[in-house]
Amino acid sequence: MRPVGSKYLLEEPLGRGATGTVWRARQRETAGAEAAVAGQPGETVAIKVLKEELASDADIVMRFLRERSVLLRLTHPNIVRVRDLVVEGELLALVMDLIDGPDLHRYLRENGPLTPVAAALLTAQIADALAASHADGVVHRDLKPANVLLKQTGGEMHPMLTDFGIARLADSPGLTRTHEFVGTPAYVAPESAEGRPQTSAVDVYGAGILLYELVTGRPPFGGGSALEVLHQHLSAEPRRPSTVPDPLWTVIERCLRKNPDDRPSAENLARGLRVVAEGIGVHANSAQIGAAENVGALLAPDPAPAQVPGAPDAAYDPNGATSVLPHTSGPAGAADPTAVLPSTGAPDPTAVMPPVPPGQPGAPGQGGPEDPHPWQNQLRAARDRNEQTQVQYLDPNQDPLRRRPQRQVSRPPQQPRQAPQGPPPQQPGYGYPQQQQPQRYATPQPQQPQRYAPPPAPEPQQPRREPRPPRQRSANPMRIPGLGCLKGCLVTVVVLFVAGWLVWELSPLQEWIGTGKGYWDQLTDWFTTVTDWIGDLGGSGGG
């Protein structure tokens, strides 16, 4: 088991997400006074260990420590309580209550959509949790079924909203740049996709998408890519399913308004959903049905929505004209505003350009063809979440690790340029009078298009050697050079056997062995016989 700090031990992983891994852990000793819940030794908790790239960001660590009190005091019956925060070296972890139950995304995948009444009551409890967090100035910004856990108590399931701390930390400047959004593309609000200031209305928009998915089984906006999904959020209207009652569709339509000022507050959303659940039920009376049909009057927007930390009050327009702040009187010793010096009679080189008429290139709000797409950063972030690593074949000739070193061609040294002869320019200083010259700006160089180096030419390949012809056997199978193989040995044995057999059959060797004479006696008798035979031949020839 892996220790986390000095008070917790990780036992087994429960899930893995985009920001870290959730572990089942056990408390070793009672937590200190800085923790929201002291706990008891042996108690089981859930710990979310953030990824190393988050823990190595100094901005996130400072926000982690600075907002410790905000996360620890965020308590509600429908919010997973953060018990403690652990910061140790390269480790950042959130200690939370362990919820024994599936998340809402898994439940919908296994059991299908909910009834309109059940969906309205479940979303009302989530809206209660959002209202409590908005009252504390905390905006979730990533509301989706995967961040809603279902706690089973007494045969009933209670939704528990989690990952508030992760959404809070994601606001760090080290992660969230200008014109980027934090969230999942299928559940992101239009103002988040456009990089506009965000308020608590983004959570109400996410609650509307969640409610739509609870009764239909899928989000209202989809597409084959992140660009299509974002385009649907910005321009398309959700389609009403035939199974959604009129009062419930009124709530969904108000939550999914493109203008955040037209969306209801989380508190009014919870109140309206409970009225709708009573009016569309089987045992609803006429008063409840009438109240549900007039639910639009209850969905009033929030007069003071919670602002996302770090969001500017107004979007920055890079093409807007420069504005001059008015002079305001301040206390003694305050810094004076910038003053314009009076004209001295010399020609003033600074000129005010006439305003560009609308519709012309360079007009405010109209980007040139080379300007980046306003959604470029959002699409890159969404694409990085959804793309997987692709493996493709690499030509060995283009592999820098296998490329042969090339000899660099020596170039002749360049001769230094000689400065033109002439009188040295007079520098303004002590020996020369200073003259006021008009300020001249160099003509801007036209932007050269980016050119890529051509691919290296393929190196000439050496001619391949012709393959060696196969070894051919001799026509005479008995010819074996040196008799150094098994075949030669067998032939030799056969020849010796045949020669011995011929000697045995054609020579008097059998008779000699049968008579028992010695080898020398047999040889002497044979020699005597041959001598007598030759002598007889000679005597008969002489007679």
UniProtKB/Swiss-Prot annotation:
Active site: 142
Keyword Nucleotide-binding: yes
Post-translational modification: Autophosphorylated mainly at Thr and slightly at Ser.
Positions bound to ATP: 14-22, 48
Start-end of Low complexity biased regions: 407-420, 428-451
SUPFAM superfamilies the record matches: Protein kinase-like (PK-like)
Enzyme class, broadest EC rank: transferase
Domain Protein kinase, residue spans: 8-276
Pfam families: Pkinase (PF00069)
Chain spans, region Disordered: 303-480
UniProt catalytic activity: L-seryl-[protein] + ATP = O-phospho-L-seryl-[protein] + ADP + H(+); L-threonyl-[protein] + ATP = O-phospho-L-threonyl-[protein] + ADP + H(+)
Pro residues biased stretches: 352-361, 452-461
GO molecular function, one term: protein serine/threonine kinase activity
PROSITE patterns documented for this protein: PROTEIN_KINASE_DOM (PS50011), PROTEIN_KINASE_ST (PS00108)
Keywords recorded for this protein, A-Z: ATP-binding, Kinase, Nucleotide-binding, Phosphoprotein, Serine/threonine-protein kinase, Transferase
Keyword Nucleotide-binding: yes
EC numbers, comma separated: 2.7.11.1
CDD domains: STKc_PknB_like
Family per similarity comment: Belongs to the protein kinase superfamily. Ser/Thr protein kinase family.
The protein's name in its UniProt record: Serine/threonine-protein kinase PkaA
Lineage: Bacteria, Bacillati, Actinomycetota, Actinomycetes, Kitasatosporales
Gene name of the record: pkaA
